[in-house]
Regions:
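Polytopic alpha-helical membrane-helix bundles and their juxtamembrane interface segments
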Residues: 1-163
């Protein structure tokens, strides 16, 4: 539905449907994370460093969104929506990166990248080759999230990302 709203030039609807999608991603990733973690497990130094890096990336994304993108959005509901959406996609990225899966992490990062390009182009300045950048990163993100979340498996000759 979000892509359809975008093709109808309904940015608010597009953003709203994608925000709902991110809520579902967060629910999936958070549920998967908490099913795997033992309650009394302590974080190692390496895990603490990784968690700090994940949170830093999300905060950098939010800073860019709030300082560069949101001010360019029209005041009112669109600007509020952009801020909410940036927060949701950041939470989605954090929960994806906590899965200890390079496919989930890369999928989430590419999803954020595609949306960042869209938002930058719409509210800050034109991005050269934005159509290609968005389409390639968005569909690759969805594919990576799909192949990791499902039972879909590829043979050893096709395993390019073996982590």
């Amino acid at each position: 539905p979000g892509d359809h709203m975008g093709s109808c030039n309904n940015f608010l609807g597009q953003m709203g449907f994608f925000a709902v999608g991110h809520v579902f991603y967060v629910i999936y990733f958070a549920g998967r994370y908490f099913r795997r973690v033992e309650p009394d497990r302590k974080l190692t130094g390496k895990a603490k460093g990784y968690l700090a890096m994940v949170v830093f990336c999300a905060l950098a994304l939010l800073c860019a969104a709030f300082s560069k993108i949101a001010p360019g959005a029209p005041a009112g509901i669109i600007r509020i929506g952009v801020c909410i959406y940036a927060t949701l996609i950041s939470i989605m990225m954090i929960t994806a990166m906590l899965q200890r899966s390079s496919l989930f992490a890369l999928g989430a990062i590419l999803f954020v990248f595609s949306d960042f390009i869209l938002a930058w182009n719409k509210f800050v300045e034109p991005v050269p080759y934005r159509h290609y950048l968005v389409l390639v990163s968005y569909f690759l993100a969805q594919w990576l999230l799909f192949i990791r979340a499902t039972k879909f498996r590829v043979g050893p000759e096709m395993r390019l990302l073996r982590f």
